[in-house]
Amino acid sequence: MSGDASTPEQDQNVVSGAVPATRESSPDAPEATSEQASAAVDPADRMQQLEQELSALKQEHDTLNSQYMRIAADFDNFRKRQSRDQDDMRKQLVCSTLTEILPVVDNFERARQQLNPEGEEAQALHRSYQGLYKQLVEVLKQQGVARMDVVGQEFDPNLHEAVLREESSEFAEDVVSEELQRGYHRDGRVLRHAMVKVSMGPGPSDPGSAPAEAAAAPDQTAEEA
């Protein structure tokens, strides 16, 4: 054999030595491709893309902030409504309880007007009852309960309950002329309407007075002549 001829072992070594060189160069291919792609992107296009992303994020932020503000406002309104409803319920319970006490006050007042105790023992008992009545009235005052002043006031169905209507020379028409049962209110809310008598006005004049006035007219004319 000549000196230039290669043995099979030498050929195998040459092939095996070439393979690693191919493997070492292969990882550089993706990196080169990425660099080429980056170099191919226009900076103006990239800036426009970033601005679009920023605009989308701002819009999402505004939407979420608006939703948050709306939820916060709804919760605040709910809290206020709950507080108002609880306050109204508490007032209704208090007014209902106070309304139940008013007939007891009426009984004390009727007893005070009608009874005329005689003797020291009866008078002492009467004073004891009146002491309880005064305490009860004081408690009602502390709770804001007040009596209605109705006589001489114009009839108001929101405050008064008309039981009778009669002619009156003292009060004009539709004016309360007499209080039959006390009315009470608390903080602008009616606990009990006042039962009243309402005036119908002075009524028609006496028919007998008209001829007398007519007869007096000629005499007055004659005197003037």
Curated annotation (Swiss-Prot):
Residue ranges with Polar residues bias: 1-15
Listed GO CC annotations: cytoplasm
Source species, domain of life: Bacteria
Localization, UniProt: Cytoplasm
Keywords: Chaperone, Cytoplasm, Stress response
Region (Disordered): 1-48, 198-225
Major location category of this protein: cytoplasm
Low complexity bias spans: 201-225
PROSITE patterns: GRPE
Pfam families in alphabetical order: GrpE
Molecular-function GO terms, alphabetical: adenyl-nucleotide exchange factor activity; protein homodimerization activity; protein-folding chaperone binding; unfolded protein binding
Intrachain disulfide bonds: none
Gene Ontology terms: biological process: protein folding
Coiled-coil boundaries: none
Subunit text: Homodimer.
Role played: Participates actively in the response to hyperosmotic and heat shock by preventing the aggregation of stress-denatured proteins, in association with DnaK and GrpE. It is the nucleotide exchange factor for DnaK and may function as a thermosensor. Unfolded proteins bind initially to DnaJ; upon interaction with the DnaJ-bound protein, DnaK hydrolyzes its bound ATP, resulting in the formation of a stable complex. GrpE releases ADP from DnaK; ATP binding to DnaK triggers the release of the substrate protein, thus completing the reaction cycle.
HAMAP family linked to this entry: GrpE
Family that this chain belongs to: Belongs to the GrpE family.
Name recorded for this polypeptide: Protein GrpE
Taxonomic source organism: Synechococcus sp. (strain CC9605)
Gene, per the UniProt record: grpE
